[in-house]
Amino acid sequence: MNKQFHSCSPDPDDGEKLDIDYLSDEGPSTLIFEPSELIDFRVAWDWQKQRQKLLFEKPGSSQAVWLLEHSECYTLGRGATEDNLLFNLSNSPWDVYRIDRGGEVTHHMPGQLVVYLVLDLRRYKTDLNWYLRQLELVLLDTLKDLGIVGKRIDGITGVWINDFKVASIGVGCRRWITQHGLSINVDCDLRGFERIIPCGLTGSKVGKLSSLIPDLKTVDVKPFIKKSLTERFGL
């Protein structure tokens, strides 16, 4: 299959129509969206850029969090090397996006829960390292609530179960307003990771939660993610 490589702009195009449903300011200080269908990566990123733009222009606006699943794609961080792609970009199995987050290449697919957060860190702590560690704690809280012992590894962002990495984190931030977030492998097909060096970690093994809890689905994990986000970010 010959899929496209996309190098995407960090801002919506001038004159781009904003998605009104995802820009509503009515309700709580943080809006949480849980679309039930698979979301194309470009659509989800547009939602984040629109919300970030709104927070730039109206700093008191509501923050936003999305819990969703993507159709298959790969994403590369802003400084990621294409050497971690084990295929030719001209013959990619799925679409590939270079985006404005940190980190190397990762893979998204159905059965993986992705959480995007557009938060104003000035409401919390203007420290990106603190923010990354909070996202790791959200993942560890979630695993604990599921009866699973997870761990962090010093110097490497993410969460592991034994020797298997089950969750990745990659964020972008402009003027202390965040984009992107985290992903956790629940009941997904992991074979797409064989085409990349995940997160640039040579020899790293990738796992999923359903290997430990058969029949676990993303819908089962969402309540625990939301619980921890509420506790740690006051959503």
UniProtKB/Swiss-Prot annotation:
It catalyses: octanoyl-[ACP] + L-lysyl-[protein] = N(6)-octanoyl-L-lysyl-[protein] + holo-[ACP] + H(+). The keyword Transferase applies. GO terms for cellular component: cytoplasm. SUPFAM superfamilies: Class II aaRS and biotin synthetases. The keyword Methyltransferase does not apply. Its EC number is 2.3.1.181. Keywords: Acyltransferase, Cytoplasm, Transferase. Its main location: cytoplasm. Pathway: Protein modification; protein lipoylation via endogenous pathway; protein N(6)-(lipoyl)lysine from octanoyl-[acyl-carrier-protein]: step 1/2. The active site is at residue 199. The record marks 165 as: Lowers pKa of active site Cys. It is found in: Cytoplasm. Substrate binds at residues 101-108, 168-170, 181-183. GO terms for biological process: protein modification process. Pfam families: LplA-B_cat. It is an enzyme of class 2 (transferase). It comes from the Bacteria. GO terms for molecular function: lipoyl(octanoyl) transferase activity. Residues 59-235 form the BPL/LPL catalytic domain. Catalyzes the transfer of endogenously produced octanoic acid from octanoyl-acyl-carrier-protein onto the lipoyl domains of lipoate-dependent enzymes. Lipoyl-ACP can also act as a substrate although octanoyl-ACP is likely to be the physiological substrate. Belongs to the LipB family. PANTHER family: LIPOYLTRANSFERASE 2, MITOCHONDRIAL-RELATED, OCTANOYLTRANSFERASE. In the reaction, the free carboxyl group of octanoic acid is attached via an amide linkage to the epsilon-amino group of a specific lysine residue of lipoyl domains of lipoate-dependent enzymes. This is Octanoyltransferase.
